[in-house]
């Protein structure tokens, strides 16, 4: 296992060789990546891969979608959202808790939803160990929020300044847009393999939304989010 010194060198290399070349140039984001110890959120079996440009599987691995996204993806999402200190954020797909920790350092409050009980418990432990106390991890299927009134019943109290989907969906879930404040942003990786689009939707008015598709990537599906029907003849 690498020494502490090697971890710091690996972290520096990750930022300089992976993150910056991917047009992540926000100094606040780069500084945060240098401070939050990614290796502390990586499962022990994969600790040596903490700074590698790849998705890292998370236990219990019942589904391949349970993983940490590649560092450059997390960094680019963080830059796109531009979360401010006074803002309230919802994340769907806690995983290891690393992205929630990054968001917690930027926001006033973060609510993060994780469908897998073991991961939710592990993420809480990781966040506490990292000294991140403004993140609440709820063991909840994020797709359940798509039903009318489901968010309030589940204790997910909006509206939110930012919503992050830490995984991909076939299309932007319009039901989640209702949880945004005016001026709020939703970040999602949208589409199908082999090419998906990082999509940022901004609520510009009570009934008005704007959308940008800034970059291409691929990410595992969030579980149970709807897939449009396709017909074959």
Can you describe what each PLM-predicted range is?
Residues 191, 195-233:
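Core SAM-dependent methyltransferase catalytic element
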Residues 78-209:
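Conserved nucleotide-cofactor-binding alpha/beta core module
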């Amino acid at each position: 296992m690498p020494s502490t010194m090697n971890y710091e060198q690996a972290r520096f290399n990750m930022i300089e060789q992976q993150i910056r070349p991917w047009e992540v140039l926000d100094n606040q984001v780069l500084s945060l990546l240098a401070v939050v110890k990614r290796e502390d959120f990586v499962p022990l079996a994969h600790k040596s891969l903490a700074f590698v440009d790849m998705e890292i599987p998370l236990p219990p691995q019942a589904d391949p979608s349970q993983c940490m996204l590649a560092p450059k993806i997390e960094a680019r999402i963080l830059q796109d959202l531009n979360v401010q200190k006074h803002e309230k954020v919802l994340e769907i797909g806690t995983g290891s808790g690393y992205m929630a920790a990054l968001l917690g350092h930027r926001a006033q409050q973060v609510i993060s939803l994780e469908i897998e009980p073991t991961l939710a418990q592990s993420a809480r432990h990781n966040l506490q160990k990292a000294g991140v106390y403004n993140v609440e991890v709820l063991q909840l299927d994020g797709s359940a929020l798509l039903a009318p009134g489901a968010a309030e019943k589940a204790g997910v109290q909006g509206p939110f300044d930012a919503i992050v989907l830490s995984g991909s969906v076939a299309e932007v879930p319009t039901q989640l847009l209702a949880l945004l404040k005016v001026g709020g942003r939703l970040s999602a990786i949208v589409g199908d393999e082999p090419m998906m689009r990082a999509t940022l939707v901004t609520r510009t008015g009570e009934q008005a939304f704007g959308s940008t598709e800034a970059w291409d990537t691929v990410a595992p599906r969030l579980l149970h989010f709807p897939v449009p029907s396709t017909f074959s003849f």
